[in-house]
Amino acid sequence: MSKNSYCYQINLQFFASKKGVGSTKNGRDSHSKRLGAKKADGQMIRVGQIIYRQRGTKIFAGQNVAMGSDNTLFALSDGIVRFQKFGSKQSKTRVNIIKHQLNA
């Protein structure tokens, strides 16, 4: 090397300008199933209308009420919905339809 020549060594380091983003296992949810009472005690109901949607037998079928394959309770006749407690400690609930002619 000559007297006037200089040797420079450049050491460049590049740093991340943005943090590396990872994925998450959260952030999703299932759609609600809209379970529960569709008709209240004392309401008028028509044949085939749903009274109660449920998983399992929380409410039992009484007179003029049938249970579908998914445990949904529905009316077998026109009338008025009546919920009734029964069992040894009144711990179970049954729904009945009191037959009543509805005006069309």
Swiss-Prot record:
SUPFAM superfamilies found in the cross-reference section: Ribosomal L27 protein-like
Post-translational modification note: The N-terminus is cleaved by ribosomal processing cysteine protease Prp.
Cellular-component GO terms for this entry: cytosolic large ribosomal subunit
One Pfam family, short name: Ribosomal_L27
InterPro entries, A to Z: Ribosomal_bL27 (IPR001684), Ribosomal_bL27_CS (IPR018261)
Gene3D superfamilies linked to this entry: 2.40.50.100
One GO biological process term: translation
Alphabetic keyword roster: Ribonucleoprotein, Ribosomal protein
Domain of life: Bacteria
Propeptide residue intervals: 1-15
GO MF, one example: structural constituent of ribosome
Family per similarity comment: Belongs to the bacterial ribosomal protein bL27 family.
PANTHER family per record: LARGE RIBOSOMAL SUBUNIT PROTEIN BL27M, RIBOSOMAL PROTEIN L27
Identification of the protein by name: Large ribosomal subunit protein bL27
Species for this entry: Mycoplasma genitalium (strain ATCC 33530 / DSM 19775 / NCTC 10195 / G37)
Lineage: Bacteria, Bacillati, Mycoplasmatota, Mycoplasmoidales, Mycoplasmoidaceae
